[in-house]
């Protein structure tokens, strides 16, 4: 990269993109960001996020290393519409030399290591209608296995006795970018979240 500006400018009026940038500044944990309400269209309607990755050149000047749609898009076949956009991760405290290779090139991870972070955008499918049946052959175990196969270890954290409930050893910073979603905790209390609402999940058992 010669340090020139990307050929396609940022869309300043797009609230979703602005919130993605703010979320990246917060860092830490596994970031849940996007949802759709019961009236929302299929998750495929959401444009894949573009990622501007910065670094430094050999002269120490700041440059754009890339500006494109992330190649790490994970779709869960057992839950059509559930899509993870893996944007960036760190392992431990980064040196910030600006010369580091893109950490997303090797593959995906379910969670960061000690002191690390993961920046991801999650698109949840709309609320299922009453009587909805999963795709043929899909069971709870097969669905969680697929989740762990595609995002290593993630399916292991789900409670088999209470579908959807899960606990992770992370602090998750979340922003509802579009749509609405409901967060439920152990005591049965729920909070209904709207566009722009934020969540700090302190390693607590929960479901969406």
Where are these regions (language model features)?
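Short, conserved beta-strand element in jelly-roll/cupin
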Residues: 123-125, 166-182
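A short beta-loop-beta micro-motif enriched in histidine and acidic residues
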Residues: 136, 159-171
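N-terminal twin-arginine translocation
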Residues: 11-20, 28-43
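Short beta-strand His + acidic residue motifs that chelate non-heme Fe in jelly-roll/DSBH
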Residues: 183-184, 206-208
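Short acidic-glycine-tyrosine-enriched beta hairpin
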Residues: 187-202
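N-terminal secretory signal peptides
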Residues: 1-14
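C-terminal segment of N-terminal export signals and the immediately downstream linker at the start
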Residues: 33-65
